[in-house]
Amino acid sequence: MALGFLTTHVLDTARGCPAADLSISLFRIDGASRHHIRTMQTNADGRTDSPILPQAEIAVGVYELVFAAGDYLRVCGYDADSLFLDDVPVRFGLTDADQHYHVPLLLSPFGYSTYRGS
């Protein structure tokens, strides 16, 4: 069994807090096809309660996390008619099934940043 897994952490940089109750969907990309694996919610710390892709399921390949930023921002009180961001897709490759991959998202109403964390 592979030893790696995939996690995330979402921070609301405009409010200076974790982005709680934000929906995240994980897809595996196979050529032109996109296969839904699961959808999870962030907890009060802006993390998921378990890995988005656990050890038993991780495999080398291309994946996409889709962060439901628009829904989250509307719940936070931002005007739905003036929102700049909606779904935020982050596509990345996993090249070693024995590594821990961490994909943080720093989110604000008008921009976001991501990187490979540790």
Annotate each language-model stretch with its function.
Residues 37-41, 53-55, 79-80, 90-93:
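Beta-strand-rich interaction surfaces with strong enrichment in secreted/lumenal proteins
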Residues 14, 30-32, 71:
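Solvent-exposed strand-loop boundary residues in beta-sheet-rich modules
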Residues 26, 44, 56-57:
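A short acidic/small-residue loop/turn micro-motif
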Residues 1-20, 28:
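Beta-strand-rich domain onsets/edges
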Residues 50-61:
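Short Pro-Gly-centered beta-turn/loop motif in secreted/extracellular proteins
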